[in-house]
A protein has these predicted regions:
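Core nucleotide-handling region used for phosphoryl-transfer chemistry
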Residues: 1-154
């Protein structure tokens, strides 16, 4: 599943969003035609399992170089300069402890590796814990399907 840009064009000032228009972002017209499936964006920290290895997302902001060994997720954003990458989670790095905890808490009984895919890390170690969880977890992207309106006014 590929995340699309904002459906309607954003207005920027100094690389910051200051508004939104009723114009459809070029390349997203298919959404208004009824194609595709909308899913809930879970609020946490993006991560992935790639070939059995656990990664967290790293955003090389405009002018910053990604860490050695980072895997690009996509091309750099031409407007903001942000360039997302995957960097391996290091179980020995204290900065990664919440990711390690989330991964381990999400394994099914007897499982040693999560399936390949992208996930959102949620819980007390992520984004202020908006879901009030007592433990960290990773949840697969695209699990909660919704059917919102497909116009600017919803």
């Amino acid at each position: 599943m590929k995340k699309i840009p904002t459906l309607f064009e954003r207005l920027y000032e100094n690389h910051k969003v200051v508004g939104i228009t009723e114009n459809v972002t070029p390349g997203c017209e298919w959404v208004l035609n009824g194609d595709g499936v909308a899913t809930v964006k879970v609020d946490g920290s993006c991560c992935a399992v790639i070939n059995g290895e656990f990664y967290k997302r790293y955003d090389a902001k405009k002018g910053k170089k990604p860490p050695v060994g980072a895997i690009p997720c996509c091309d750099p954003d031409q407007t903001t300069g942000h360039w997302p990458h995957w960097v391996k989670v290091d179980a020995n790095n204290p900065a990664d402890k919440h990711f390690v905890d989330a991964y381990e808490n999400s394994l099914a009984v007897g499982e040693t590796v999560m399936p390949n895919g992208t996930y959102e890390a949620i819980g007390p170690g992520f984004q202020g814990n908006p879901y009030g969880l007592v433990q960290n977890y990773i949840v697969p992207h695209g699990e909660i399907v919704i059917n919102p309106g497909r116009t600017f006014n919803g």
